[in-house]
A protein has these predicted regions:
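Extended, low-polarity transmembrane helix blocks
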Residues: 1-64, 70-148
Length: 148
């Protein structure tokens, strides 16, 4: 994909991200549900796409930082479906944990933050810098939800 093809998903992602920040601040219970659903649906989508069209994930290498490029075009390209499926299972667990309370909720928050920071080096393929803003929204969610 070239930059022109990324423009619409990039813009939509940033609008959603700003909405999530707002919800996590103003209505943390809604933010919690929204994030839980997002992670679960993203995990399901990634399992399906990772199995049916693994090349789509290898294509993200063109926009990634060099360290990620080497990994994507190396080991990852040989085991794309397996690696994407394992990551997607992690996304589903994060989503489930975000529906929980206390320790599991915190694990969901931490897992989500780590995941979002880990995909940031994919560049525009991860809609960077929205991934950093999303991680901030999860921190905000944790702080605000504990007070709600």
């Amino acid at each position: 994909m070239n930059l022109q093809e990324y423009w619409l998903p990039f813009t939509v992602t940033h609008v959603i991200t700003l909405s999530l920040i707002f919800f996590c601040y103003k209505w943390p219970k809604i933010g919690k549900v929204a994030w839980g659903i997002i992670f679960i649906l993203a995990g399901i989508f990634n399992i399906y796409t990772g199995i049916s069209n693994p090349q789509a994930y290898v294509d993200y290498g063109s926009q990634a930082v060099d360290l990620y490029k080497r990994f994507i075009y190396g080991v990852f390209s040989s085991y794309t479906s397996l690696i994407v499926s394992l990551i997607a299972l992690g996304q589903i667990l994060i989503g489930i944990f975000l529906f929980m309370k206390r320790t599991l909720f915190l694990l969901g928050i931490l897992g989500g933050i780590i995941f979002l920071l880990a995909i940031s080096p994919l560049g525009i393929g991860s809609a960077f810098p929205s991934t950093l803003l999303m991680a901030i929204s999860l921190v905000l969610l944790y702080i605000r939800y504990r007070k709600a």
